[in-house]
């Protein structure tokens, strides 16, 4: 899948769109607890299509009449705003470091009830603010408002904040680039997620990650 394409919105009858509907159904099947609403997407390495995949899944869920919030927590290399063609604006980092209301920084996409929370201003300490009590309180509040909260994050093998987010989430999906990712790295990523006490729901193998 080409980077940056919202295929599930532009081509809802395509094979790829149908694959995302299958992913949605599988996640529903694996989630028996209705209070499990926060799902993290991460990858073994960088450039494996995590942002594009999670954005397409968010669109798929919104088209099924779910109220969805997509959070770009890849604070080092954010991409969600580019996928949805949104201008750089206040977002997650501003919400965590300033006295702002979440409703003032949420972006509506116009696709069903899909909202996005972009990464916000650049910071030097992503792990520190992700570890804050405010981050956890924010996620708890979002669970009372949205049916599903999807979190985009950087690679699990390199960054502490992804391990923290995995622990906060009700389920984690791992992205792997076919022909790009070594099996040893996949095994190590699974081990790191287990150490973070993450609920690993499954793996998505992305055929075209560039």
Where are these regions (language model features)?
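Short boundary/hinge segments that flank catalytic cores
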Residues: 1-47, 183-210
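P-loop/Walker-type NTP enzyme "switch/lid" segment
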Residues: 2-21, 25, 32, 43-45, ...
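Short, well-ordered alpha-helices that flank and scaffold nucleotide-derived cofactor binding pockets
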Residues: 25, 59, 63, 167, ...
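Alpha-helix C-cap/termination motif
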Residues: 30-33, 64, 109, 145, ...
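Conserved beta-strand segments that form the floor/walls of ligand-binding pockets within enzyme
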Residues: 40, 115, 152
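Hydrophobic positions on the alpha1 helix immediately C-terminal to the Walker A/P-loop
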Residues: 52-53, 57
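Helical hairpin unit composed of two closely spaced alpha helices linked by a short loop
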Residues: 65-69
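Conserved catalytic-core segment of NTP-binding enzymes
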Residues: 98, 127-210
